Amino acid sequence: MHIIADANMPGLEPFEAFATVERVDGRSLTREQLGDADVLLVRSVTRVDRALLAGSQVKFVGSATIGTDHVDLAYLSEAGIQFAHAPGCNARAVAEYVLQAVLLLCARQGREVQGARVAVVGLGNVGRRVADWLSALGMEVRGCDPLLDAQGYAGPVALAPLDDLLDADIITLHVPLTQSGEHATGHLLDASRLSRLGPGQMLINTCRGPVIDNLALSQQLASGTGPMTVLDVWETEPQVPATLYQQVVMGSPHIAGYSLEGKLKGTSMLYDAVCQWSGQGIASGTAMADAPPLNPAVNSEADLLALLQVAYRLEDDHRRLGESLHDTDPSAAFDRLRKHYPVRHELHYWQYDGSVDDTWRAIISRLFEPD
């Protein structure tokens, strides 16, 4: 079996027990490179469609991602090509990113997190975890997910139409990118909806850049009437508008889910899918080295933020992205930031044995519980 895989995917070694694995640059992959490959493993930077696959021998496509907007699923079905992806693989990493962003933004505003009103837009694997964690912080969480609502959702998060949630203190986006249908999410936050947000509010986007009209957002931020904003995703990435970067509180190069555990879990889910499809291979599993315990006390929001930053500092990614914009080729620099991203662990990699005030016990329990 011949497998072509994005070189930025870790944990590909188990495939080598039954296949030849060829690692390639996912963003620049061409049909000619596919050759006699049976399996193609990608990330979100590779557009998988008829133009790439027609005439190839590829019989299985796997994407180590939550979203599938980069894959033409209709074409794969038409061509009889099996498909698998990795829903929820990096949900914890994204939730940790959002939690840190919330704490940073609240600190900037001098606002306590407890009692703040949050709108979680999209209640998939990531959105549900974010909603649960922010609820554990004592925040008032409501959600928007019309597809889930139509299925008779009866979960712990109260649902409401998006337009009824635009007065929330914090709006965090966790939807797939879709450009058609009754509930399309392209420019879900368009100029009209953005105009209803003000500087006392906070906006976080970690799903897909085009979910927000970036030009309209930039114009509103320039006028001084826009919300405090954190963007991990950009409508024109890998090109990041320098003006918009300067306007947001924090920006990063589409890495919210870039924990080592999340990446390995995504690859492992594809490994299991390929094994099931091909009848080859054995159950996967990647052992992590034992990590030293963490024991700082958590008695305040500042303590919780400091604990999160043991694993990851959002400010570091903001700085690195800003530096990349001065490169002679900022788009290539954006990709390099992702390709050479520092190893980042999720908090549950460590064992926590510090003292915790009762106020923070629920969130600490969630952060360190095993998968």
UniProtKB/Swiss-Prot annotation:
A cellular component annotation (GO) from this entry: cytosol
This enzyme's EC code(s) = 1.1.1.290
What reaction(s) does this enzyme catalyze? 4-phospho-D-erythronate + NAD(+) = (R)-3-hydroxy-2-oxo-4-phosphooxybutanoate + NADH + H(+)
Per the UniProt entry, what is one GO biological process?
pyridoxine biosynthetic process
Swiss-Prot/TrEMBL keywords: Cytoplasm, NAD, Oxidoreductase, Pyridoxine biosynthesis
Annotated GO MF terms: 4-phosphoerythronate dehydrogenase activity; NAD binding
Residues noted as binding NAD(+) in the record, renumbered to the chain: D145, D232, G257
Pathway this chain belongs to: Cofactor biosynthesis; pyridoxine 5'-phosphate biosynthesis; pyridoxine 5'-phosphate from D-erythrose 4-phosphate: step 2/5
User: Matching CDD domains, A to Z?
Assistant: ErythrP_dh
InterPro entries registered for this protein in UniProt: D-isomer_2_OHA_DH_cat_dom (IPR006139), D-isomer_DH_CS1 (IPR029752), D-isomer_DH_NAD-bd (IPR006140), Erythronate-4-P_DHase (IPR020921), NAD(P)-bd_dom_sf (IPR036291), PdxB_dimer_sf (IPR038251)
Enzyme class, top EC level, equals: oxidoreductase
> Where are the annotated coiled coils located?
none
Q: Where is the active site?
A: R208, E237, H254 (proton donor)
Cellular location(s): Cytoplasm
Q: State whether it acts alone or in a complex, and with which partners, per the record.
A: Homodimer.
What is the official name of this protein in its record?
Erythronate-4-phosphate dehydrogenase
- The organism named in the record is Alcanivorax borkumensis (strain ATCC 700651 / DSM 11573 / NCIMB 13689 / SK2)
Gene name? pdxB
